[in-house]
Swiss-Prot record:
This is Chymotrypsin-like elastase family member 1. Gene3D superfamilies: Trypsin-like serine proteases (2.40.10.10). Residues 1-16 form the signal peptide. It is found in: Secreted. Keywords: Calcium, Disulfide bond, Glycoprotein, Hydrolase, Metal-binding, Protease, Secreted, Serine protease, Signal, Zymogen. It holds the Pfam family Trypsin. It comes from Bos taurus.
Amino acid sequence: MLRLLVFTSLVLYGHSTQDFPETNARVVGGTAVSKNSWPSQISLQYKSGSSWYHTCGGTLIKQKWVMTAAHCVDSQMTFRVVLGDHNLSQNDGTEQYISVQKIVVHPSWNSNNVAAGYDIAVLRLAQSATLNSYVQLGVLPQSGTILANNTPCYITGWGRTKTNGQLAQTLQQAYLPSVDYATCSSSSYWGSTVKTTMVCAGGDGVRAGCQGDSGGPLHCLVNGQYAVHGVTSFVSSLGCNVSKKPTVFTRVSAYISWINNAIASN
């Protein structure tokens, strides 16, 4: 159930079956963060039996709304979000547990065609989050903002710490500078798999997203402020941390109008 798209569908786009996107991301090559370093980060969890399990990340964008990846909520399951969490396996005393009341997936999302984009969803919570030093709203970029190449960014999440490894118990972060579209869409990188509605970051072969990071934020520093410019979407099927295969994110600035309309109409 851990999600981070592995691009299994890339063969449909002229790629060999040995290198395709995978949608189950976690932070590889990262470090544990101190508590409340990224207070807009949430853990999206699904219920199985009487227990809850982490499946994806997400960002609190309104007191009753969370932004995540569409592929995280494809299945018909019962979800909740955990805000203010740090260690998934213990009670930090700062958590807020809120049920997901409604899931709004982008209408153009197609789980059989990840390369088309639209890997974004917003979740309406059953009650409003209480904002404090551990739970804050994420800052979204202005509509249409394009990151300059090598913009400082951090991915955060509880995803696997290495390809085929275990989930992290404490929240991790990894420095992933942005890779501009011209570079990321070149033949030696992702080629035509990457679209202008996506953001690439990393690709050094050391640090990356991995299974369990999906849906979580890419925090980028622009004009002195960190904003959530990406929603973690997919990595290469060859592994999470493959050189010249940056982690790929949904570009939040391409969907600001959709986000606002989805919230207003739901």
